[in-house]
Design a protein with these regions (language model features):
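Alpha-helical transmembrane segments of multi-pass membrane proteins
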Residues: 19-26
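Alpha-helical transmembrane signal-anchor/signal-peptide segments
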Residues: 26-45
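Short conserved aromatic/hydrophobic patches within beta-strands of well-structured domains
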Residues: 47-49
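Generic detector of short, well-ordered, non-transmembrane alpha-helical segments enriched
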Residues: 41-45, 115-117, 193
């Protein structure tokens, strides 16, 4: 390569980067994710009892001020699984986190932020769930554990399933979401308010809940819940 061409490469790269920056949409333009924050509560979701909850101060403090939350705790309404009347029965947590203007300060890769909440030994793998409307979606399934207390010295096991929902997109990994977001910014001129949808619960043999039972209940809730809140007409 001739010296002149080599000298021009940095300038060409800088011009290309400047062009990308200028091509990005304005900061105040956000396209809403194709998912409703209004998860059903009470007995509105057949087979389940839902109770709306508030995000914690810890969750709020580490995310941008314009991050939006929607959280509902569910218990199976059938005594064949576990009763919402039993205050000691496991709860299945469903949450949606909507990004703000600065997505990097609103939505994080779960495998990175969950350890900060006390979860450890995280392992992830791809999974698919068939929904009640006949559609099949890809998820990431995380297994982890969290200490019950220093005095006990043992842990509860946790299962989480998650996806990212954009405008007309459902992505099962953080990398897929980032790539889609970059494509939309560069080629369609849009900035999306991405939503992070997660459902999880805990299990332990000494409380009478096996991993298989916990996993089955989480999958059953997702199968019933997502058809109610995803805006399928956008897909």
């Amino acid at each position: 390569m001739k010296p002149l061409f080599r000298a021009l490469i940095p300038a060409a790269v800088m011009l290309a980067m400047l062009g990308v920056i200028l091509a990005l949409p304005q900061k105040d333009v956000l396209v809403e994710a194709s998912i409703s924050p209004d998860m059903p509560t009470g007995t509105a979701l057949a087979g389940w009892y839902g109770r709306k909850t508030q995000e914690t101060e810890a969750e709020r403090s580490i995310l941008a001020a314009d991050t939006k939350f929607s959280k509902v705790n569910y218990r199976a309404a059938s005594l064949d699984d576990f009763s919402y009347r039993d205050s000691h029965a496991p709860i299945i947590d469903a949450s949606i986190v909507f990004s703000g203007q600065d997505m990097n300060a609103s939505i994080h890769r779960p495998e990175l932020c969950l350890p900060a909440q006390g979860f450890r030994n995280l392992t992830g793998r791809p999974a698919t769930i068939e929904l009640a409307n006949g559609k099949t979606l890809a998820f990431t399934r995380l297994s982890s554990e969290r200490p019950r207390s220093e005095k006990r010295g043992d842990s509860l096991h946790f299962i989480h399933y998650y996806v990212f929902v954009g405008k007309g997109h459902i992505k099962s990994t953080h990398l897929q979401r980032v790539m889609q977001d970059m494509y939309d910014r560069l080629f369609t001129g849009t900035v999306e308010r991405w939503a992070y949808f997660q459902v999880g619960t805990y299990w332990a043999e000494d409380i009478g809940i096996s991993e298989e039972e916990a996993d089955r209940n989480v999958r059953r809730l997702i199968s019933s819940l997502l058809p109610r809140i995803i805006m399928w007409e956008d897909m």
